Amino acid sequence: MIRHIAPLALLLLCATPALAQVAATPTPTAPAAMPDQPKPTVVRVALQTTLGTIEIEVETERAPITAGNFLRYVDGKRLDGTTFYRAVKVQEGFGLIQAGVRNDAKRVLPNIAHEPTTKTGLSHTTGTISMARAAPGTASGDFFITVGDMTSMDAHPDQPGDNLGFAAFGKVVSGMDVVGRILDAPKSPTEGEGVMKGQMLAPTIAIVTARRVKTPPPAPVTPPAL
């Protein structure tokens, strides 16, 4: 089964030029076994949408610039009333959904520095939340969530051109069923320009609120039976 993802490197910004980068075809990869380590600091955010709630753990320690930017939008209630407006379904269970402020002058904050995955150690596995951008350093208030492993969106310094990838900054921990419903939602056959034509949700899916929520305490460790 071939999972062709080349167009995805071109579709991640709203009303901005497409990226020059062409992503390679991703292949599912099993995570390497790692020794037990303290879990990095995270902040949990709930996106309440009209199709259900998506909870995300935002990596404030590993991706401080990008996570801090997202939390400024959350804490300022700038995402309340915005929408998931785009869904790209490459094949069943594989694609992405995009949301954000869409350059709304009343909501948008200044662009942030690009924080590549080579710096954060994060990767675009399924359920990753990451920033939409054109050139590096142009990300602001639009983001996407992956469905399926898309490690071609990570930084690849050994490749030519714009090889810095996208800035992942968290992971969906609850509500991937909602993400899937948004991915499958109806799209307009005529809206959108260029590669985005046919990818615009119609109707859009509203983000009613975006709020910090308490992170559940870790589950108690059960000692092995003697």
What are these regions (language model features)?
Residues I5-P17:
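Bacterial N-terminal signal peptides
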Residues I2, A20-L226:
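Cyclophilin-like peptidyl-prolyl cis-trans isomerases
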